[in-house]
Every structure is written in structure tokens, then in C-alpha cells.
């Protein structure tokens, strides 16, 4: 990364890495949560993984939005992945070559429209993400944080710690992680 920056200082470079060591985030490194399965369970686990990385000081974390392995995707599941990923520091929709690609137009009109709305929201947030990418973490609030950061002593918050996140400083999102939930909750 440092070599690329010296080669062309006008550009900002980043890499997506499977591993991490302290200090990498200053170089533009992005961590992702690995090759996860296409499932509601995997979607439900991602907020906790992302929050853990952020609490450890890693500013940019992503996942294979939609899941990577398996053919269990449904229009509703993929829509929920898109809606969750639209608010993450890095949105990376990705799947195995053996799976149906996670393109909105392949999942029906209603799901495709909902996924496009999530993508449009993501595009509206691009200036914010670019500003965060250009500003070192100590000089700005984290992009993602737990809602309960000040209430660790209260027992009722322990379970929520893995699923609720405050994104983009002022937006609060709890991603839908079960099929019965029909919309992203906003608090």
C-alpha cells in the first residue's frame, strides 16, 4: 500500500484482506468476515462480527453481502442483505461461482426494487464514506458503534450488543435477521 501511494500520491488505495494486524487500517486495509453461508443465521451473525472489529479499532469491515456459499437465497433474504450492507463501511455483494449471482434483477420485481432502493441509499452515503476514509479514526467518530456503548453494566443490553449498531453517527439501524421481520427497524 505504501509503495502504491508513493507511485501515485493522488490516488487513495485500499485492499481487502483475510487477516489483520494492528496498524493496518492506517494503510487503507479493509477486513471481511470470510466466506460465509447464504443464510439467515449468517446475516444475523454479521452485525456482531462487524461491531467486534470496530471496537478493536478496525475502521473498515465488510462481509460477503448475500452470503458466499450455498444456494439458499430467496428474494427476501437477499433484499435484507442489501438493506444491511447499504449502511456498512464497505458494501461488497459477492457470491461463489457455483451460486446464482446476487444481482437484483434475478430475484423478481418487488425484491429488485427494494434492492435498488438500498443501493440508491448507499450512493447517497458515498460522500460520507469517502470523508471517513480520508480522516484518521482518532479524528472522527467510528463509522459503526454499539448503541449500548455507555451501558455495559446493565444486563439487559448484553444480548443487544451483538445485533444493534449505530451507523454513520446519527443513523440507528437494527438489521432484520429473521424472515418474519418485514422492514429494517429504525430507533
Question: Where do the model's predicted regions map?
Answer:
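Catalytic-domain carbohydrate-binding cleft regions of carbohydrate-active enzymes
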Residues: 1-187
Amino acid at each position: 500500500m505504501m509503495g502504491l501511494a508513493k507511485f501515485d500520491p493522488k490516488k487513495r488505495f485500499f485492499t481487502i484482506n483475510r487477516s489483520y494486524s494492528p496498524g493496518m487500517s492506517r494503510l487503507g486495509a479493509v477486513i471481511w468476515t470470510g466466506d460465509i453461508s447464504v443464510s439467515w443465521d449468517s446475516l444475523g451473525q454479521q452485525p456482531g462480527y462487524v461491531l467486534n472489529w470496530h471496537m478493536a479499532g478496525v475502521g473498515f469491515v465488510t462481509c460477503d453481502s448475500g452470503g458466499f456459499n450455498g444456494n439458499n437465497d430467496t428474494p427476501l433474504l437477499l433484499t435484507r442483505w442489501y438493506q444491511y450492507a447499504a449502511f456498512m463501511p464497505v458494501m461488497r455483494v459477492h457470491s461463489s461461482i457455483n451460486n446464482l449471482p446476487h444481482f437484483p434483477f434475478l430475484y423478481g420485481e418487488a425484491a429488485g426494487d427494494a434492492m435498488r432502493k438500498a443501493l440508491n441509499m448507499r450512493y447517497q452515503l458515498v460522500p460520507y464514506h469517502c470523508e471517513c476514509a480520508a480522516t484518521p479514526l482518532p479524528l472522527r467518530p467510528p463509522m459503526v458503534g454499539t448503541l449500548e456503548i455507555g451501558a455495559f453494566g446493565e444486563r439487559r443490553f448484553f444480548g443487544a450488543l451483538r445485533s444493534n449498531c449505530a451507523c454513520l453517527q446519527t443513523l440507528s439501524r437494527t438489521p432484520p435477521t429473521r424472515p418474519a421481520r418485514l422492514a429494517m427497524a429504525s430507533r
